[in-house]
């Protein structure tokens, strides 16, 4: 039987930070210490997946990849990958009560590119990265390729990419983009390494202090996602990977007209054939 316990719901993005959005940095560790001091047991957070248009963690480009907005620059500086001057004068937004997602989307990219460049130039760090790549190959390669190709087409949704062979994952098209976008693909891999390194270290710290993390995950994946791109047979889609039906909920106390989420419905018979793997 569980003992009676309490906790706090506080998503990472809501932590105080100088970078326009909460991160896995010192304020997160301070919050863990606060939970310990106030005799809490649980820290509840929202999904940590990468966000798409609308900046909702429930509409993600991937069911697995992490949100790189949460990568802390000070921690990268401690690794020798950045200098404070790389980000100290950057305007990440000046409203302490709200995140300017569009601003940080563009402001963070060149800083992360600098960190990735310095990381790849440091041979002493590559063994751990290679280990990360090997352990996450089931999703990491596809995600990095998806994001790089998506960026190549102006960040358009999967279904609107100009090259329909890329949408359909034609082998010759994929090989072409792997060569053309090799640098960008590597960028998306390394930033995922940064994310999971920082998140794992924070979670381990919390657990060692007796704080348990209550996570969350979306019910569905987004139509514009790597899963729809790589596993279309698992969803109810047309030949262009557009959803035939979309998820939502009927009217309730939160919405008099109901909600239409736009996520593709699962093809449950195909999931059953694959053992729900």
Where does each model-flagged region fall?
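N-terminal catalytic cores of NTP/NDP-binding nucleotidyl/phosphoryl-transfer enzymes
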Residues: 7, 11-30
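Catalytic domains of carbohydrate-active enzymes, especially glycoside hydrolases
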Residues: 26-51
């Amino acid at each position: 039987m569980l003992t009676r316990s309490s906790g706090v719901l506080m998503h990472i993005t809501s932590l105080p930070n100088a970078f326009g959005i909460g991160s896995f940095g010192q304020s997160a560790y301070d919050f863990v210490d606060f939970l310990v001091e106030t005799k809490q047991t649980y820290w509840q957070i929202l999904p940590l997946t990468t966000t798409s248009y609308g900046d909702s963690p429930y509409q993600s480009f991937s069911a697995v990849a992490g949100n790189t907005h949460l990568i802390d620059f000070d921690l990268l500086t401690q690794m020798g990958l950045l200098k404070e001057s790389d980000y100290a004068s950057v305007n990440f937004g000046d409203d302490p009560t709200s995140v300017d997602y569009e601003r940080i989307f563009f402001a963070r990219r060149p800083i992360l590119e600098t960190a990735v460049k310095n990381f790849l130039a440091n041979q002493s760090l590559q063994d751990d990265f290679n280990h990360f790549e090997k352990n996450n190959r089931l999703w990491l390669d596809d995600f990095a390729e998806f994001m790089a190709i998506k960026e190549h087409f102006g960040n358009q949704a999967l279904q609107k990419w100009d090259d329909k062979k890329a949408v359909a994952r034609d082998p010759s098209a994929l090989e072409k983009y792997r060569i053309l976008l090799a640098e960008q693909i590597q960028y998306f891999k390394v930033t995922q390494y940064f994310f999971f390194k920082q998140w794992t270290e924070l979670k381990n710290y919390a657990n060692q202090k007796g704080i348990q993390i209550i996570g969350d995950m979306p019910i569905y994946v987004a139509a514009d996602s790597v899963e729809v791109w790589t596993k279309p047979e698992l969803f109810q889609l047309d030949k262009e990977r557009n959803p035939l039906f979309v998820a939502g909920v009927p009217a309730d106390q939160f919405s008099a007209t109901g909600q239409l989420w736009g996520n593709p419905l699962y093809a449950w018979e195909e999931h059953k054939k694959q053992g729900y793997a």
